[in-house]
From Swiss-Prot:
Source organism phylogeny: Eukaryota, Metazoa, Chordata, Craniata, Vertebrata
UniProt topology in membrane: Single-pass type I membrane protein
Protein name: Neurexin-1
Disulfide bond annotation, renumbered to this chain: 228-243, 245-255, 444-480, 650-679, 687-698, 692-707, 709-719, 890-898, 1059-1087, 1094-1105, 1099-1114, 1116-1126
Glycosylation: residue positions: 125, 190, 797, 1230, 1392
Organism: Mus musculus (Mouse)
């Protein structure tokens, strides 16, 4: 016989009274599924994530049907068990959206017999057991091994609403399954009995148990009725059947005797809300401030068994319904968070019970019936005598179904009360003993009755009838009225808040409310008292206030309280409460003690000191604080107030001292922005739409997104507004002078900075009265955080001194960096950019930071500083201190306590510029302190190619030099192991009259770094690590006689002419004029630069304008003209009829080999055929270059080792008697030709790519093998690029049989002005034939002008680099310079500052990061700073190199002969580091080949340097 399940309240509720009373477990009852549409049963969620199992018994005759199902509510994971294929069980499941795994049992189970089914989950495996006969398993191929389960366990079918919502089902096909028809019983999860939660269209089928021992409440043998008659409710207490006849109108053990005297309570039966027969109901409405009070003082209660019954209807979650007793003898019945709470104490400790409904809460505005019974029972005690003891059995039931039974403690069994019976509330509910709530009831109470063996108190009736012992407080309506609900509100922004009236809680008080949020931080409640001043002989005057606060920090809830004797800070709950669920908070205090409870967990506290009075004089703020906080005093302990963390989330059911507060109405009255009268949690995550712009970091908040803009350079809710930039030049600052002194224990600081200096103050808090500071600064390229709390002044337990943290590295790179500081009491965290945070813990007990100012750029409050940090040069942006963006607040005028002279906007910073007017000007400063490490920074601007910028000598050989050489920066130093040189990397010479930034550093591991603008060069040196400097530091130059004694690697022969600025010497910013020990020459503040600058028409006839510091000069070399502005005629010769010839011969030891040539000449003639200029190589080599006229057109032929190459201007007829200028350039096999202003003719021979690769390869081929290799390449058809051993320049073409007749002017060839030399009777010039000089040598060719011209050539000509076979005449008397080869971190050999070269195969002189010439690159990609560039050769070039090696092997005998033949010639030696495959010899500008020594670390090699191998040139 089955009992149908009952529907109630719109939900399908199983009639689980029998189940919860033990029938499911003890009677062996099963669930009968009729196979009807809409049938379903839901069991509690089975967490089948990892390792778990569930089992049940099944009986059916059906071949198809859904047995069970659960999933993750529409995402990926599910498990389904169905009957299919002739009554066999089929199991399917999936994890992480993988292909579902399926297994089909072999044994049919639709035979009408009971079968045991067990499902075992083990990560990706699931096993199905049927009886003991079959076990099969299957594995899902999933990337994740854990299953996610959100839904309940559905058995027999799915609820209709779930079938209708396809998106909530992971497996859509489950909606189409037939419902199961049959019986299921004994559902277990992990061996524990599982009870159904709810269901529909399912019957509870009673079957006799398999074994004896029925329940005491079972029906009799005849099956008629039960133990309790007339509708009595049976419950089992101590294994005995107990009948509740109170609602039947009968009495007796089995409710069989009619009771004519006792009012029946049948109307309280489940589902029967009608009136009892002909009897009046006693109902009262309570609205939060009303209550009944029955005086028991005349007739005290003394009983061991009693009963309380009542009915209630409410929408509120919390409220006192009934209380009697005091101290340790009481009964308390209340509604707590929508559940019914019972607390009983008979003197030996409280018995607490909480009854919660299966679905929803009891505050559903429906009638619910409560019954509490207490009976004296014998209970077996375990002790020495094993005796039976008397205990009180307590049972509470709600709606006759939900029952909780327990025992009071020890031997106390009597309830005694001579106090009052409170109904619906009390004068101070929070102070009642054992009260779990602090507010009164709001709703309707009906038929409140207390009875025991001696007395029956119908409290509702007594109140209505006006019994003299019953007092009614407030206006009570004796009917059920709708009580206005306390609607929840939502604080949508951190700035929103509500002001509540002052809370008068001097001695006692209580506050309760519910909240829910997902945000980690927020001030929920705050109020403080009148400020009072405390004075002490040892302490300065301090302001103290009483205060009360409840706040959230990092997801935890804290209570803060100070009554004048010290602050307490209590964490109300160990778990975080920002999970989006509702939490009920109840705060109660009585004097110095009290409790704070969250949901059911209560935390007691006792305030320190003697004060018991909480004197709050200000309003009580809910959700946050007003923007204008001038009248508020923030205790340092309330971190959220000082951090400006307002609460964002929902609040409801606020009760203060038991009185409800309609906060929705208050918000409307106050017109509070950002407060919404409802509470809902949006399912969509706001950050999914990427609302944060400009790479802001998004965090999901409560129905909102929160953007972290600190690392973006933008501000605003969505990082949409560009933050203001402040520029600092070392003399600038911004100072925030706060209106009142601040005291904080927690700070959030963030800022962005950009600087090229390794030192400088970023931000600091300063105090006028103490050494307290929180300071951020750059220190050796790192961010340094200093927190100093002045313990001496306030006589606290002194700490070990300032706490410091360091983060970041090489932050002086002129890039934006973000710094974040978080301090919470003693805890420190420092983060730079996205690097790992550095954390620290402060020592001592003192955590309060005092400050009057927030300063940037310069610290002005210096009274308590032992050392003043260096001033800042750079840019600051987005400075935010505790939520205040001060830079933008200052700019916008939002605050009036801001003082600054830093400049708004991003500006190029040139700090304290100084001009060195002449090359003999310099200053001397105090010795540079760079013993263990060094950070130098300066800016310079010049037009000079060379000059000494910085020099400091020291003990022994120690020194440091920074200089310009040919427009490139050199850093030279000696730490004691020999001099080293690092050449700075730059794309072009730096003497371009533009500002350049230079950073030079050395760390403790001897890593040297040179950074010029954005290009970086690094080198590690071995050996000594200390730079021991002693003498003065010279800036701009030294005394004239000192240049001769400078170290050999120093090229400077004169000082620096130009501007220096932003000089930073290891964090010291010297004033180059004021701080100078002495000055020499003309030095002025500021930097005006040249008074005359290059213009488009500064130089005539296509002359090149060269900017000089005191003006400009013109490079006329390729114009054929002369003079300061290239508008004077060049040296001119007339070649008359019969012809003539001017011949220049290089000395035998000075014959250059060139990769690039430049030739220019002016002429006029009427000849159709003639040779103007011819350059020939040494006899037997066959290389030449010839400029000629053919059929009236100009052309050039040249040969550099293989075929003749010709280039001609075919469009211009030049034998017209007019003056023409021809310009020719060659680079390898490529050539250009231009006549006058005609377009440039270009010629690129085929196979040029191979030529470039050959040029790379030839750099690694010794000169002695060059000719052999060239011959081998000639056979292979390769085009060479070197014009070898140039011997003569022949002008006039007489020897070639095509003599020139006409005028030739201003001949220029690779730096030689041959016609000028002829006019000056140069010894290497021979003139024959009819040749006549026109006029005089141009006046511009003075010695000074020539030097200027040659300087111009060096600075602009990159294709006329030459190499001679021996030292030039000008340097012949001086030993060759010896320069070290130093290893950098990237295996770059740092050699000469000039062009590194092979002695034949020469590259144009271009700077590289290590001092080596970079091979020509294809494309525009720059090498990574500080690294050597790698050139990958093609397979054809690889084969070529193999051939080169083979050819070299065949030439050994030839080399031996060559060494003997040329042993008396001047030598140019070089050293190759075989392990690095880099060539390290360097060419001087005058053509000298420099001898070099081994690396300085190889001391033995230095000692034997005279025994090095020598190579000779063929």
């Amino acid at each position: 016989m089955g009992t149908a399940l009952v529907q109630r309240g719109g939900c399908c509720l199983l009639c689980l009274s029998l189940l919860l009373l033990g029938c499911w477990a003890e009677l062996g009852s099963g669930l009968e599924f009729p196979g009807a549409e809409g049938q379903w049963t839901r069991f509690p969620k089975w967490n089948a994530c990892c390792e778990s199992e569930m089992s049940f018994q099944l009986k059916t005759r059906s071949a198809r049907g859904l047995v069970l199902y659960f999933d993750d509510e529409g995402f990926c994971d599910f498990l389904e068990l169905i009957l299919t294929r002739g009554g066999r069980l089929q199991l399917s499941f999936s994890i992480f959206c993988a292909e579902p795994a399926t297994l089909l049992a072999d044994t049919p189970v639709n035979d009408g017999a009971w079968h045991s089914v067990r499902i075992r989950r083990q990560f990706r495996n699931t096993t199905l057991y049927i009886d003991r006969a079959e076990a099969k398993w299957v594995e899902v191929k999933s990337k994740r091994r854990d299953m996610t389960v959100f839904s309940g366990l559905f058995v027999g079918g799915l609820p209709p609403e779930l079938r209708a919502a396809a998106l909530k089902l992971t497996l859509a096909s489950v909606r189409e399954r037939e419902p199961f028809k049959g019986w299921i019983r004994d559902v277990r999860v992990n061996s524990s009995q599982a009870l159904p939660v709810d269901g529909g269209e399912v019957k509870l089928d009673d079957e006799p148990p398999n074994s004896g021992g029925g329940s005491p409440c079972e029906a009799g043998e005849e099956g008629e009725g039960g133990v309790c008659l007339n509708g009595g409710v049976c419950s089992v207490v101590d294994d005995q059947a107990v009948c509740d006849c109170s609602r039947t109108g009968f009495r007796g053990k089995d409710c069989s005797q009619e009771d004519n005297n006792v009012e029946g309570l049948a109307h309280l039966m489940m589902g029967d809300q009608g009136k009892s027969k002909g009897k009046e109901e006693y109902i009262a409405t309570f609205k939060g401030s009303e209550y009944f009070c029955y005086d028991l003082s005349q007739n005290p209660i003394q009983s061991s068994s009693d009963e309380i019954t009542l009915s209630f209807k409410t929408l509120q979650r919390n409220g006192l319904m009934l209380h009697t007793g005091k101290s340790a003898d009481y009964v308390n019945l209340a509604l707590k968070n929508g559940a019914v709470s019972l607390v009983i104490n008979l003197g030996s400790g409280a018995f607490e019970a909480l009854v919660e409904p299966v679905n929803g809460k009891f505050n559903d505005n429906a009638w619910h019936d409560v019954k509490v019974t207490r009976n004296l029972r014998q209970h077996s005690g375990i002790g020495h005598a094993m005796v039976n003891k008397l205990h009180c059995s307590v049972t509470i039931s709600v709606d006759g179904i939900l029952t909780t039974t327990g025992y009071t403690q020890e031997d106390y069994t009597m309830l005694g009360s001579d106090d009052f019976f409170y109904v619906g509330g009390s004068p101070s509910t929070a102070d009642l003993p054992g009260s779990p709530v602090s507010n009164n009831f709001m709703g309707c109470l009906k038929e409140v009755v207390y009875k025991n063996n001696d007395v029956r108190l119908e409290l509702s009736r007594l109140a209505k009838q006006g019994d003299p012992k019953m007092k009614i407080h407030g206006v009570v309506a004796f009917k059920c009225e709708n009580v206005a609900t306390l609607d929840p509100i939502t604080f949508e922004t951190p700035e929103s808040f509500i002001s509540l009236p002052k809370w008068n809680a001097k001695k006692t008080g209580s506050i309760s409310f519910d909240f829910r949020t997902t945000e980690p931080n927020g001030l929920i409640l705050f109020s403080h008292g009148k400020p009072r001043h405390q004075k002490d002989a040892k302490h300065p005057q301090m302001i103290k206030v009483d205060f009360f606060a409840i706040e959230m920090l990092d997801g935890h809830l804290y209570l803060l309280l100070d009554m004048g004797s010290g602050t307490i800070k209590i964490k109300a709950l160990q778990k975080k409460v920002n999970d989006g669920e509702w939490y009920h908070v109840d705060f109660q205090r009585d004097g110095r003690s009290g409790t704070i409870s969250v949901n059911t967990l209560r935390t007691p506290y006792t305030a320190p000191g003697e004060s018991e009075i909480l004197d709050l004089d200000d309003e009580l703020y809910l959700g946050g604080l007003p923007e204008n906080k001038a009248g508020l005093v923030f205790p340092t302990e309330v971190w959220t107030a000082l951090l400006n963390y307002g609460y964002v989330g929902c609040i409801r059911d606020l009760f203060i001292d038991g009185q409800s507060k309609d906060i929705r109405q208050m918000a409307e009255i106050q017109s509070t922005a950002g407060v919404k009268p409802s509470c809902s949690k949006e399912t969509a995550k706001p950050c999914l739409s990427n609302p944060c712009k400009n790479n802001g970091m998004c965090r999901d908040g409560w129905n909102r997104y929160v953007c972290d803009c600190s690392g973006t350079g933008y501000l605003g809710r969505s990082c949409e507004r560009e933050a203001t930039v402040l520029s600092y030049d070392g003399s600038m600052f911004m100072k925030i002078q706060l209106p009142v002194v601040m005291h904080t224990e927690a700070e959030d600081v963030s800022l962005r900075f950009r600087s090229q200096r390794a030192y400088g103050i970023l931000m600091a808090t300063t105090s006028r009265d103490s050494a307290d500071t929180l300071r951020l600064e750059l220190d050796a390229g790192r961010v340094k955080l200093t927190v100093n709390l002045d313990c001496i002044r306030i006589n606290c337990n002194s700490s070990k001194g300032p706490e410091t943290l360091f983060a970041g590295y090489n932050l002086n790179d002129n890039e934006w960096h973000t710094v974040r500081v978080v301090r919470r009491g003693k805890s420190l965290k420092l983060t730079v950019d996205d690097q790992q945070a550095m954390t620290g813990q402060m020592a001592g007990d003192h955590t309060r930071l005092e400050f009057h100012n927030i300063e940037t750029g310069i610290i002005t409050e210096r009274r308590y500083l032992s050392s003043v940090p260096s001033n800042f040069i750079g840019h600051l942006q987005s400075l935010t201190f505790n939520g205040m963006a001060y830079i933008d607040l200052c700019k916008n005028g939002d605050i009036d306590y801001c003082e600054l002279n830093a400049r708004f906007g991003f500006r190029n910073i040139i700090a304290d510029p100084v001009t060195f007017k002449t090359k003999s000007s310099y200053v001397a400063l105090a010795t540079l302190q760079a013993y263990t490490s060094m950070h130098l920074f300066f800016q310079f601007k010049t037009t000079s190619l060379d000059g000494l910028i910085l020099y400091n000598s020291g003990d022994g050989n120690d020194f440091i030099v920074v200089e310009l050489v040919k427009g490139y920066l050199h850093y030279v130093f000696d730490l004691g192991n020999g001099a080293n040189l690092i050449k700075g990397s730059s794309n072009k010479p730096l003497n371009d009259n533009q500002w350049h930034n230079v950073m030079i550093s050395r760390d403790t591991s001897n890593l040297h770094t040179v950074k010029i603008d954005t290009k970086i060069t690094t080198q590690i040196t071995a050996g000594a690590r200390n730079l021991d400097l002693k003498s003065d530091l010279y800036i701009g130059g030294v005394a004239k006689e000192t240049y001769k004694s400078l170290p050999k690697l120093v090229h400077a022969k004169e000082g620096f002419q130009g501007c220096l600025a932003s000089v930073d010497l290891n964090g010291r910013l010297p004033d180059l004029i004021s701080d100078a020990l002495f000055c020499n020459g003309q030095i002025e503040r500021g930097c005006e630069g040249p008074s005359t600058t290059c213009q488009e028409d500064s130089c005539s006839n296509q002359g090149v304008c060269l900017q000089q510091w005191d003006g400009f000069s013109c490079d006329c070399s390729m114009t054929s003209f002369s003079g300061p502005l290239c508008n004077d005629p060049g040296t001119t010769y007339i070649f008359s009829k019969g012809g003539g010839q001017i011949t220049y011969k290089w000395p035998p030891n000075d014959r250059p080999s060139t990769r690039a040539d430049r030739l220019a000449i002016g002429f006029s003639t009427v000849q159709k055929e003639a040779v103007l200029v011819r350059v020939d190589s040494s006899s037997g080599l066959g290389d030449y270059l010839e400029l000629h006229i053919h059929q009236g057109k100009i052309g050039v032929k040249f040969n550099v080792g293989t075929d003749d190459i010709a280039i001609e201007e075919s469009n211009a007829i030049i034998n017209d008697g007019k003056y023409h200028v021809v310009r020719f350039t060659r680079s390898g096999g490529n050539a250009t030709l231009q006549v006058d202003s005609w377009p440039v003719i270009e010629r690129y021979p085929a196979g040029n790519n191979d030529n470039e690769r050959l040029a790379i390869a030839r750099q690694r081929i010794p000169y002695r093998l060059g000719r052999v290799v060239d011959e081998w390449l000639l056979d292979k058809g390769r085009q060479l690029t070197i014009f070898n051993s140039q011997a003569t320049i022949i002008i006039g073409g007489k020897e070639q049989g095509q003599p020139f007749q006409g005028q030739l002017s201003g001949l220029y060839y690779n730096g030689l002005k041959v016609l000028n030399m002829a006019a000056e009777n140069d010894a290497n010039i021979a003139i024959v034939g009819n040749v006549r000089l026109v006029g005089e040598v141009p006046s511009s060719m003075t010695t000074e002008s020539t030097a200027t011209a040659m300087q111009s050539e060096m600075s602009t000509s990159i294709m006329e680099t030459t190499t001679t076979l021996a030292t030039s005449t000008a340097r012949r008397g001086k030993p060759p310079t010896k320069e070290p080869i130093s290893q950098t971190t990237d295996d770059i050999l740092v050699a000469s500052a000039e062009c590194p070269s092979d002695d034949e195969d020469i590259d144009p002189c271009e700077p590289s990061s290590g001092g080596l010439a970079n091979p020509t690159r294809v494309g525009g990609r720059e090498p990574y700073p500080g690294s050597a560039e790698v050139i990958r050769e093609s397979s054809s070039t690889t084969g070529m190199v193999v051939g080169i090696v083979a050819a070299a092997a065949l030439c050994i005998l030839i080399l031996l002969y060559a060494m003997y033949k040329y042993r008396n010639r001047d030598e140019g030696s070089y050293h190759v580091d075989e392990s690095r495959n880099y060539i390290s010899n360097s060419a001087q500008s005058n053509g000298a080949v420099v001898k070099e020594k081994q690396p300085s670390s190889a001391k033995s090699a230095n000692k034997n340097k005279k025994n090095k191998d020598k190579e000779y040139y063929v």
